[in-house]
Amino acid sequence: EGTLHEAHLQEYQQQGKHRRLVTVFQGVVMGYQFARPFSSTTLVRQDMGLLNGLINFGSRLTGLKLEPVKMVHPDFERRFEVVSTDQVEARYLLHPAFCERLMEMEAAFNGQNMRLAFAQGRVVVVIETKDMFESGGIEADGDDARFATTIDQLGSLIDLTQALNERAR
């Protein structure tokens, strides 16, 4: 059981007497019950190099003791930062085949900001994108390419959904 939403979050920002609407997030948000039982909290985000330490410090302020996890998949380790309350369970959730699917999904979305949260038996996947289901406008030029990209992206979402429903072997 899961949900898939295309979301556009905006907020007003004040600069002197001027108030303007700014996009905070635009993209896809998916939430699913994970097929494998788990009790830890695990977060996955694109690797930010030296900034990872600052972000990890900020995560300690939430009361969770999230520690960096070394992953067995070398390409995944290079591209993503994983933090968790349980190192062993994080590797159990993010097994190599699942990591492959995540990297395929990242490629389908052109490496745009993708994040995952595993908590309370569920996984939430957030990917920043432009409007997935909107055409380019009145002019049809480029619509075929946009349609093909959308099909690839939806295919990667379906593949990930299937991976989420796979039980441990």
Label the predicted regions.
Residues 1-169:
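Charged, low-complexity intrinsically disordered regions
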